[in-house]
């Protein structure tokens, strides 16, 4: 049974096995004393989390080994990095790059976001703000300096007949006296119950990245959509 079909079953079972207060009484004491049933829900929810993690890992692994955009090719530098080892529910990453210090990190969250939408929402905005705060933290730690966060922008993309909406924000900073730029792109895939973050990091002045980022983003989101569709079909 695939994740999409199995999740509701496990969740309903988990709810059915939530601890229920039970009252007992005696002749000496008419007061009710609550007694909790054994907890089974934690194990079931852990099972759901495990299934989601396996699906997210398979999804990030399904991304193409290379991504082309115009005349540029970005090859896989790190196929799958398991962030679950560091923090439960953290998710998985795949890293692309070229020979000129361009790094593209795809991050697929493992966060069980039920009821999420493919469109940009207040939740998307809040998640973007959280990641932008990380740049301030990097500056406070001395790893970055001269951090400048640009305006957030909602962008509509289309690829292979599919529509995608993302929230994007440019960030410029200096790292070891080198001027760099990051472009954060945040989208969502409701079928995978997950947000997708793509971070482009490159030396300032690389106009080719400005031209290619939308194509790369659309290709990645489309590949994840194809994976999700195949999972539903099986």
Enumerate the language-model features and the residues they cover.
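C-terminal motif of bacterial Sec signal peptides marking the signal peptidase cleavage site
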Residues: 13-14
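Sec-dependent signal peptide recognition
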Residues: 2-9
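Surface-exposed amphipathic alpha-helical segments
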Residues: 193-234
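Extended hydrophobic
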Residues: 178-201
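A short acidic-to-branched-hydrophobic micro-motif
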Residues: 91-130
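Signature of long, low-cysteine stretches enriched in small and polar/charged residues
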Residues: 137-185
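N-terminal "mature-domain start" segment
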Residues: 19-103
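Glycine-rich, often proline-containing surface loops adjacent to acidic residues and nearby aromatics
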Residues: 101-105, 163-165, 191-199
């Amino acid at each position: 049974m695939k994740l999409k079909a199995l999740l509701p079953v496990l969740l309903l079972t988990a709810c059915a096995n939530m601890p229920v207060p039970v009252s007992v009484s005696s002749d000496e004491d008419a007061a009710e004393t609550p007694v909790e049933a054994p907890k089974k829900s934690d194990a079931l929810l852990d099972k759901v989390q495990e299934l989601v993690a396996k699906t997210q890992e398979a999804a990030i692994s399904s991304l193409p080994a290379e991504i082309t955009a115009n005349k540029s090719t970005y090859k896989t530098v790190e196929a799958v990095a398991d962030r679950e080892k560091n923090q439960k529910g953290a998710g998985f990453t795949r890293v692309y790059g070229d020979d000129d210090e361009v790094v593209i990190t795809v991050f697929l969250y493992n966060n069980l976001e039920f009821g999420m939408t493919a469109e940009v929402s207040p939740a998307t905005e809040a998640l973007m703000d959280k990641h932008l705060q990380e740049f301030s933290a990097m500056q406070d730690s001395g790893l970055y300096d001269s951090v400048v966060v640009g305006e957030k922008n909602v962008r509509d993309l289309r690829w292979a007949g599919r529509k995608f909406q993302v929230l994007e924000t440019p960030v410029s900073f200096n790292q070891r006296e080198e001027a760099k730029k990051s472009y954060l792109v945040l989208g969502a895939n409701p079928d995978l119950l997950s947000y997708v973050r793509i971070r482009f990091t490159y030396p300032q002045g690389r106009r080719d990245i400005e031209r290619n980022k939308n194509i790369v983003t659309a290709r990645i989101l489309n590949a994840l959509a194809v994976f999700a569709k195949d999972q539903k079909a099986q």
